[in-house]
Amino acid sequence: MEGLKDNLYIVRLKDEPNSLLKKFKSKDTYLNQFLERRAKRHQDELLAITYLLFLRKNDGDELVGYYTLSCSSVTATEYVRSKFHRNKQYEDYPAILIGRLAISKDYENKGFGSFLLRAIKYTVSEDQYIAGRFLILDAVKDSIDFYQKNDFDFWTKEDKDEPTRLMYFDLLQI
């Protein structure tokens, strides 16, 4: 991954041909189908924006991964409130939802997922097109360690037995 960083770039999904999107294969069939069949429609309906990660190659750029972002909010829990010692605490916080994040099978476990999370954190905190205190996501059980290694924490303890866990990253940490 180290030597490839200069050859990576992220673009917003626009008019990429369906054939390019169809070639993308992560280990999750649902995420593959979303990119191919629903990502453009979600953008048209203002539900989420999809960003594509490409690797510049001599024989043509390769789609390595993608993620989606949308606006959201989270209701503060006692668990989270205990972590923030402020005079004023809010019931609800604006948040930016990472709805989907996928990396191609060929590039899994090589740092590309962490690269995307760093890019998301930097972009939303620096560009500030919209305010959001937290990045949030619903992590499936087998991805929780990955998100914890990337500084995400659990929003609540109450969902520990659920198939997904709500996790967050506090953008004030940047």
What does each of the following model-derived ranges do?
Residues 117, 124-139:
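Conserved GNAT acetyl-CoA-binding A-motif
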Residues 136, 148-167:
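Conserved catalytic-core motifs of GNAT/GCN5-like acyltransferases
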Residues 109-123:
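Conserved acetyl-CoA-binding loop-helix of GNAT-fold acetyltransferases
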Residues 59-100, 108:
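Conserved acyl-donor/pantetheine-binding loop and adjacent beta-alpha core of acyl/acetyltransferases
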Residues 2-45, 59:
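Short amphipathic alpha-helix that is part of the acyltransferase structural core
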Residues 99, 104, 140:
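Residue-level recognition of the GNAT/N-acetyltransferase active site
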Residues 50-56:
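Cytosolic beta-strand hydrophobic patch enriched in CBS
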